[in-house]
């Protein structure tokens, strides 16, 4: 302590002097607060000045705290960015913020990114609950995302309710929801892992993939052990079987819709042309192929909870190469590693067979009954909660081009979908399938939050005779 005290009397860089003062303060049983007062002078570097003010505000008397508060007030309202940054950082070290809280709203709008990021850390350090929504909003902007994430993680379990609310809000972007799941993984407490595993069992698609990756990345395999402790091997096998059954539904759709490009329901159009009818069918087929790839990826992620990560990764790499010799090597690795009940069905996914053959090999998990293309499309829409937004939109585009009827329930539910381009696709379908019903619905959609959708509504109202905004 004496060595540090002697060091603090020398000419030091501001950052070193600030650390020395903080060390002395934390080490001394009865620190001399008056010794810090000279550092409050405006001529002192803001790093040191802010540190001294924060230390005084921790244990000073009323007059000393008032003096330190005034120093920080001047720093927070200073024209120079560095003054405001150091003043803001000092707030995070001070236990007493009453007189300075009124500056927080302005600091949240400060032109300096460094000030705004520093303030997010202050909100977390001081547990200023009234400003927690600002931490969540910070996740939505690239410039403040990392600072907001670190600040939220520092809250530990206190942040969990906020993060769950954000992660489960379907009206938020996938990126923002991913940040919420990521924060839960970085918090890493028993309670946070409970939330992640619970949602793993009920989530689908992108959300399930994100949760799996987050759990796998947790240090010391805490996520892997957390999953095995909570749902066990049988639970993981159930999740793999769910993915296999979903892939079976995709194969059924690809098989039943394979003839759509020459299907006779494209009125007055050459079935061999590259017109919209053929294009929309191909768009849906590509979207379904993408869903198959995503589900396959989730199967590999799930296997990493059961088998050595390097082994599963090697198999995935070889199979993804597409080269026959490497694919065979990948299948051999899986064959020697995997021992789940549905092993043969799983390996079947990676073999060089047609969709029809693969579908036949999944018979122990799902019974395939051929359907007409229109019935298969309606069946897909019954599975809409498992489809990606783009695949769902493609279903409506194909129904519109092919003049296939969909149920009112399917149409109305998807008209309330959180993604704008899905609502666009439903409106375009209704314009062809039921103009009268569309005309009744349009007035309710004029204030759609998506500008493209609201513009589409206005155009349709003018075209169908419903008028525009008044």
List the predicted regions and their residue ranges.
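Structural detector for internal amphipathic alpha-helices that build alpha-solenoid repeat scaffolds
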Residues: 1, 6-7, 15-29, 38, ...
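Amphipathic alpha-helical scaffolding segments comprising HEAT/armadillo-like alpha-solenoid repeats
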Residues: 1-9, 29-41, 62-75, 96-109, ...
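Short inter-helical turns and helix N-cap capping residues of alpha-solenoid HEAT/ARM repeat scaffolds
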Residues: 12-13, 44-45, 79-80, 111-112, ...
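Catalytic cores of nucleotide-enabled group-transfer and carboxylate-activating enzymes in metabolic
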Residues: 155, 200-209, 226-251, 256, ...
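Intrinsically disordered, low-complexity terminal tails and inter-domain linkers enriched
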Residues: 262-274
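A cross-kingdom feature marking charged/low-complexity
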Residues: 287-295, 351-391, 453
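Alpha-helical scaffold segments of alpha-solenoid architecture
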Residues: 307, 319-328, 332-355
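Short amphipathic alpha-helical surface patches that serve as generic macromolecular interface elements
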Residues: 392, 408, 420-427, 439
């Amino acid at each position: 302590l004496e060595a540090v005290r002697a060091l603090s009397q020398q000419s030091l860089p501001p950052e070193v002097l600030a650390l020395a003062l903080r060390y002395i303060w934390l080490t001394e049983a009865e620190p001399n607060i008056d010794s810090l007062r000279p550092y409050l002078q405006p001529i002192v570097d803001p790093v040191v000045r802010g540190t001294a003010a924060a230390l005084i505000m921790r244990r000073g008397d009323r007059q000393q705290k008032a003096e330190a508060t005034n120093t920080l007030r001047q720093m927070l309202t200073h024209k120079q960015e560095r003054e405001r940054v150091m003043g803001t950082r000092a707030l995070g070290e001070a236990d007493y913020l009453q007189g300075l809280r009124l500056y927080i709203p302005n600091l949240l709008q400060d032109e300096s990114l460094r000030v705004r990021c520093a303030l997010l850390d202050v909100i977390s350090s001081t547990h200023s609950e009234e400003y927690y929504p600002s931490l969540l909003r910070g996740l939505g902007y690239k410039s403040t995302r990392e600072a907001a994430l670190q600040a939220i993680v520092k809250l530990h379990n206190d942040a969990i309710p906020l993060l769950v609310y954000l992660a489960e809000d379907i009206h938020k972007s996938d990126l923002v929801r991913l940040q919420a799941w990521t924060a839960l993984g970085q918090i890493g407490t028993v309670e946070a892992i409970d939330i992640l595993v619970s949602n793993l069992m009920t989530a689908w698609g992108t959300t399930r993939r994100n949760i799996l990756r987050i759990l796998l990345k947790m240090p010391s395999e805490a996520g892997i052990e957390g999953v095995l402790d909570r749902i066990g091997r049988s639970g993981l096998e159930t999740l793999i079987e769910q993915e296999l059954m979903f892939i079976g539904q995709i194969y059924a759709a690809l098989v039943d819709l394979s003839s759509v490009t020459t299907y006779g329901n494209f009125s007055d159009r050459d079935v061999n042309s590259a017109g919209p009818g053929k294009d929309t069918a191909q768009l849906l087929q590509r979207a379904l192929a993408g869903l198959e790839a995503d589900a396959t990826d989730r199967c590999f992620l799930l296997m990493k909870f059961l088998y050595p990560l390097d082994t599963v990764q090697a198999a995935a790499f070889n199979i993804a190469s597409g080269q026959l010799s490497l694919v065979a090597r990948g299948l051999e690795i899986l064959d020697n590693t995997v021992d789940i009940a549905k092993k043969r069905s799983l390996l079947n996914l990676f073999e060089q067979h047609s969709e029809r053959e693969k579908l036949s090999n999944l018979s122990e998990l799902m019974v395939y009954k051929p359907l007409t293309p229109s019935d298969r499309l309606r069946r897909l829409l019954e599975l809409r909660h498992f489809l990606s937004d783009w695949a769902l939109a493609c279903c409506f585009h194909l129904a519109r081009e092919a003049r296939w009827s969909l149920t009112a329930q399917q149409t109305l539910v998807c008209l309330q979908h959180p993604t704008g381009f899905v609502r666009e696709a439903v409106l375009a379908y209704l314009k062809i399938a039921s103009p009268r019903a569309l005309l009744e619905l349009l007035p309710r959609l004029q204030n759609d939050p998506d500008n493209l959708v609201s513009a589409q509504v206005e155009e349709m109202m003018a075209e169908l005779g419903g008028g525009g905004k008044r």
